[in-house]
Amino acid sequence: MNLLIMGLPGAGKGTQAAKIVEEFGVAHISTGDMFRAAIANQTEMGRLAKSFIDKGELVPDEVTNGIVKERLAESDIAEKGFLLDGYPRTIEQAHALDETLKALDIKLDGVINIEVNPESLVERLSGRFICRSCGSTYHKVFNPTKVEGTCDVCGGHEFFQREDDKPETVKRRLDVNIAQGEPIIAHYRELGLVSDIQGNQDIDDVFADVKKAIAAIK
């Protein structure tokens, strides 16, 4: 079984990916892990990627696509199948993946799309705040301080938000992800591969829906 999992930042994609891998025994292929392994093993594409990273430059698509192809050609993929996580990020990468799968004679069985309302994601992702004195991290909805305005750990009263966690920054980041992701989802929807999963539920309820979708694919 060969799957792709998609979802906006904060949608719980990573949590569901881990559960899928544990339940079904497929190889978890995440972009970060692929890059680290290719560089550590000094593959042709790994050496190329490292040359860009060492210069502080973005790794070009053709190198990223090459690293994905190297990984998908490994023997465990034929034995176990895979869950691809974090790739493709652009429609160009999606088309490159189509070509890679065709070249390797691999069939993509389905795309799990974790859907969460963007406004809910802004709340999830922008609610984090940090104690200035001891660095303890809280969330205004999911993990507030026991006493409002007082750190549970050190009793401090000064808190701050990282720039990345501010609502306007989070919204900008989500807008970019939505703009990049919509054409990819549309592409796979045309191929009849997409299963939409409602992510605004308890983690176990989301996974129950994921399992139903996978059962329908199988």
From Swiss-Prot:
Specify which residues bind AMP according to the UniProt entry for this protein: T31, R36, E57, L58, V59, G86, Y87, P88, R89, Q93, R162, R173
Domain of life, per UniProt, equals Bacteria
Main subcellular location of this protein, as a coarse class:
cytoplasm
Q: Please name the InterPro entries in this protein's record.
A: Adenyl_kin_sub, Adenylat/UMP-CMP_kin, Adenylat_kinase_CS, Adenylate_kinase_lid-dom, P-loop_NTPase
Q: Which parts of this chain are annotated as the region NMP?
A: 30-59
EC number(s) reported in the record: 2.7.4.3
Q: Which GO terms describe its cellular component?
A: cytoplasm
TM region positions: none
Query: Where along this sequence does the record place binding of ATP?
Result: G10, A11, G12, K13, G14, T15, R128, T137, Y138, Q201
Q: Tell me, which GO biological process terms does this entry list?
A: AMP salvage
Pathway per the UniProt entry: Purine metabolism; AMP biosynthesis via salvage pathway; AMP from ADP: step 1/1
PROSITE patterns named in the record: ADENYLATE_KINASE
Which residues hold Zn(2+)?
C131, C134, C151, C154
Q: Where is this region: LID?
A: 127-165
Alphabetical keyword list: ATP-binding, Cytoplasm, Kinase, Metal-binding, Nucleotide biosynthesis, Nucleotide-binding, Transferase, Zinc
Q: Which SUPFAM superfamilies match?
A: P-loop containing nucleoside triphosphate hydrolases (SSF52540)
Q: How does it assemble?
A: Monomer.
Q: What is known of its domains?
A: Consists of three domains, a large central CORE domain and two small peripheral domains, NMPbind and LID, which undergo movements during catalysis. The LID domain closes over the site of phosphoryl transfer upon ATP binding. Assembling and dissambling the active center during each catalytic cycle provides an effective means to prevent ATP hydrolysis. Some bacteria have evolved a zinc-coordinating structure that stabilizes the LID domain.
The free-text function statement in the UniProt record for this protein reads:
Catalyzes the reversible transfer of the terminal phosphate group between ATP and AMP. Plays an important role in cellular energy homeostasis and in adenine nucleotide metabolism.
Protein name as catalogued: Adenylate kinase
